[in-house]
């Protein structure tokens, strides 16, 4: 059975947004909160999961991660708002 692949966006304590890739969102968010995630999120805890997208392949997820990381902050905020509102 193939694993699901996810792209996620976190809202950090300093109000910045972090985008990442994982196969287990719950575990990865916990790692970020524990200071064991990406260097970027260390010292910016606690983090809040504000957006996720699921993909069937790692390549599709990684491509989407790159797309989101390339967005302006305003466009990232709209992406998050579309999911929450």
Curated annotation (Swiss-Prot):
Region (Disordered): which ranges?
58-85
Signal sequence span per UniProt?
A: none
Can you give the residue ranges of the GIY-YIG domain?
A: 3-78
Concerning CDD domains, the annotation shows:
GIY-YIG_UPF0213 (cd10456)
Instruction: Name the source's superkingdom.
Output: Archaea
User: Which family does the record claim for this protein?
Assistant: Belongs to the UPF0213 family.
What is the protein's given name?
UPF0213 protein NP_0776A
Q: Whose protein is this, by species?
A: Natronomonas pharaonis (strain ATCC 35678 / DSM 2160 / CIP 103997 / JCM 8858 / NBRC 14720 / NCIMB 2260 / Gabara)
């Amino acid at each position: 059975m193939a694993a699901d692949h996810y792209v996620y966006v976190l809202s950090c304590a300093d109000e910045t947004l972090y985008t990442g890739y994982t196969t287990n969102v719950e575990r990865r968010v916990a790692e970020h909160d524990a200071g064991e995630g990406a260097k970027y999120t260390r010292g910016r805890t606690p983090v809040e999961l504000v957006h996720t997208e699921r993909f069937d392949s790692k390549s599709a997820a990684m491509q989407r991660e790159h797309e989101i990381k390339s967005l302006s902050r305003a466009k990232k905020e709209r992406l998050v708002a579309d999911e929450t509102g």
